[in-house]
């Protein structure tokens, strides 16, 4: 039987980072993953360049960029290991990077630079600390015993493992083609943890074939919009780019909104957020003889202008021949466009999974669950960040908090 201090289940961003930090605290760590490759989500993120953090994260106010039943749970970990801490590590390894948009940091060359950095960190154990990886290796079962001392025994496809502590870093259900499974949720339920129902997040929205028929020909077009969902005094809104697809909507604005969207509720879009369109059109009647489609093409892609004006006969006239009321209706349709999605593209295209292990059953200081010696970190926990590097920073911060807690518990000074 293989004996280690810590067994980490999952060789993704959180699992690898936790392993490296723990080994550098003198712990012997075994990382296992049923998938043959490490950190595949890092590899494919950011168009292959990995949006590895966001420099504008305010760790004191995680509710501004994270969601979950209790987003403030993340404050402790995010405050103790900040975006600036991870940036310093990236710089230490000589990895060139750049800011692309709204604090989002990307590797200049390739996400592989970041993966190689994490693997080098795993090799930099101190005080006898080591990291061993078993891949591909499936977990068959996990049991706990408190005699003669508290420990776990894992049955795996490569044999038995005895560990003083277990860290579940197995991620969510997003992108199953790179190995996502519900293993973390099953382990949580086995040991009595509560769950917040998982759902796809940062995911394209879809519409019924009938509802989307007028817009299907716009697939591939992108434009900046203001997008909103929710009711009451504080609806959720984002000003980002939107992308038309064959089945619905994608792009940063849509991915952001999708994390908050509730089934059966409408979304509202303003396709010209920086323009008083009705006033502009009515004022232009005196000086322009263009038809409405050509007029709108000054601010919108011509395919959008053509598709929109084709919806009603009164919008297919020249600008001077269109009534003020019809122009107002056209402006409203573009600047207060309300549609109810039929669903999402699901886990296959979701960047992350919302929901997960209920944070009420975890320590915000250590990530340890109410089951002694069992920890949960990263995406498997009910903390979900915005698009733009927030979810990776949660992975680094929760992993760091966990690794430091493991060292304090298993290698006390």
Task: Label each residue range with its predicted role.
Residues 34-129:
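Conserved N-terminal/central alpha/beta ligand/cofactor-binding core
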Residues 34-38, 43-44, 52, 56-62, ...:
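An anion/pyrophosphate-binding glycine-rich loop and adjacent beta-alpha core
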Residues 135-149:
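A conserved short coil-to-beta-strand element within the FAD-binding core of flavoproteins
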Residues 7-9, 161-177, 188-189, 242-245, ...:
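Short hydrophobic core segments
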Residues 135-136, 306-384:
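A glycine-rich dinucleotide-binding beta-alpha-beta segment and adjacent secondary-structure elements
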Residues 2-4, 156-165, 237-239:
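Core beta-strand elements of the Rossmann-like FAD/NAD(P) dinucleotide-binding domain
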Residues 4-31, 402-407:
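N-terminal Rossmann-like FAD-binding beta1-loop-alpha1 element of flavoenzymes
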Residues 125-139:
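A conserved beta-strand/loop element that lines the FAD pocket in flavoprotein oxidoreductases
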